């Protein structure tokens, strides 16, 4: 590791390998490359100082270099301790962009790196956040509340909160008043994922959101593509790389049937598994049933299934009492953002055997064992390399457009949570059609008049559900 320079990566010598993969990824990310072509000359993000907290993968490297091409200064960390691709981080660091990300970093390092992405070498402040899961945003807002005298740091609810609060206290001591200054300097945040969006809506509901936010997750070209088609490819990839298990014929349980659950169930079904689904929502449960999946309660299948995957964004979905009853060598993993969907903390007093990085065998007193992937964190990124470049291009193009919106239009957005307008959603989709050889049908003037829309779109009302 290098501590002298303004980056922390596992091995800077991996930069050449990372650059080769970045070059390949660019050919699969037409949305981002179109943004460079459209906005590269005008540089709408000139003056933007973006703090980025998002999985430091090859695809994210293409996003980072797109933001730079559009004029932004950037400091970056991963939003997950296992999701960094070390060669990607090295390539970005070698290009002169400060990045603080190491695959397998500790939680203490994770929160130190989150602090570092706000610490500009000239002592300046970030004016934009690009977030995934909301940790960077939460770090600043919690610190500012502590500076205001609120008692928000005295009762940590987990080991991670203990470490987070310690890092906030460290910064409070080193730089009194810094959190409030940093909060007030922010023009806005764009948020990538369901979990982070929930946090933002909760803040807005309580009147605690101090700047505008764009909910990238609920752009159609994110949630219906990244969440669904991305998981459809990357879930099984992660399980295979971790375990080499034959999935055909196995019984797999997917907890949750939202967009991520739909993609995950399709992924396992495509690999030949017999898939069952658990759900709390009657609409999603009906969708699962009509898609051909048996909808069950976890308690009814916990002792007979072979693979368990959580996709919900909720906590305590798979609990210690469930895992205790699982068959020997059942595989347990999560593809939701945080690690609390599975009660991993309750397993710590059992016998752990590390098989290889991010694959652990845990033995219960009665002798049955489970295989836990990525310690309950995102297995598609911890055990594999995440979603393919093409689908991430759609998500990240939304991020770029969101950053441009908030940075270039100060005052036009209130301190609320917004979704990008329909015409931009359609633009993102359009940018990805040529790569797939798609030819759109065009409306005639009479047809457009008949249904009351412009020939150029938007083609659907805001309330339309895709």
Curated annotation (Swiss-Prot):
GO cellular component, one term: cytosol
Positions annotated to bind substrate: 57, 132, 192, 222, 226
Binding site for NAD(+): 193-195, 227, 256-261, 279, 314, 335-337, 380
Co-factor binding details: Binds 1 NAD(+) per subunit.
Compartments (UniProt record): Cytoplasm
Top-rank taxon, per record: Bacteria
NCBIfam families referenced in this protein's UniProt entry, alphabetically: ahcY, PRK05476.2-3
Homology family: Belongs to the adenosylhomocysteinase family.
Chain's role: May play a key role in the regulation of the intracellular concentration of adenosylhomocysteine.
Protein name: Adenosylhomocysteinase
Lineage, broadest ranks: Bacteria, Pseudomonadati, Pseudomonadota, Alphaproteobacteria, Hyphomicrobiales
Name of the gene encoding the protein in the UniProt record: ahcY
